[in-house]
A protein has these predicted regions:
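Conserved loop-to-helix interface motifs that mediate assembly, gating, or partner/ligand docking
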Residues: 2-188
Length: 188
């Protein structure tokens, strides 16, 4: 049977651990709040950009004179799928939901006899698809070493996609990403 001193030390240790856990919880809550604010601040810009691109694409009457990027190749034989996930885990269904949707689309593309090419952005997506679809992965991008993701990283991904398009490496591109609704829900 433990002595009274041993019990006091154990109680003290548990209380100390509780204090540390509470502090970590407060830091995590502050980081989550900041991330949520940033996501909500960027939403109007992304919606406006989406509307501009859709209006531009819909306003083109003659496909022959339209820029190749908007008019497309006119075929749908080769699909480039860009899977965007996190580099770190412990975020619930964030990565799993988007990978599930992507895998369903990969199966459909392959079943239709189309050529599939995949670019992964984030290590968690690659980890989840590499067993079944690893042979289709043409490029792996990870920004794990960067503390904060900015426009430069998005531009890097965009340049890779544009370079592949100009080299006629694909006919259609599908982006798989989560749309932030709130802290609990991200829609793939």
């Amino acid at each position: 049977m433990p002595s009274l001193d041993d019990l006091r030390k154990r109680i003290s240790s548990v209380k100390s651990t509780q204090k540390i856990t509470k502090a970590m919880k407060m830091v995590a809550a502050a980081k989550l709040r900041k991330a949520q604010e940033n996501a909500e601040k960027g939403r109007p810009y992304s919606e406006k950009m989406k509307n501009i691109i859709n209006n531009l694409a819909n306003s083109i009457i003659e496909k022959e004179t339209a820029p190749k990027l908007i008019a497309g190749t006119g075929q749908d034989k080769t699909y480039l799928c860009v899977l965007m996930t996190a580099d770190r885990g412990l975020c619930g269904g964030f990565n799993t939901n988007i990978c599930r949707l992507a895998k369903t689309n990969f199966q459909k593309i392959i079943k239709e006899g189309k050529t599939l090419k995949i670019i992964t952005v984030g290590t968690k997506g690659l980890d989840q698809i590499k067993r079944d679809y690893g042979k289709y992965v043409i490029q792996k991008l990870s920004f794990k070493e960067r503390k904060k993701i900015s426009f430069q990283e998005a531009e890097e991904v965009g340049k890779i996609i544009l370079d592949l398009f100009h080299k006629n490496e694909f006919d259609k591109c599908i982006l798989f990403y989560n749309n932030f609704k709130n802290v609990i829900t991200q829609i793939p």
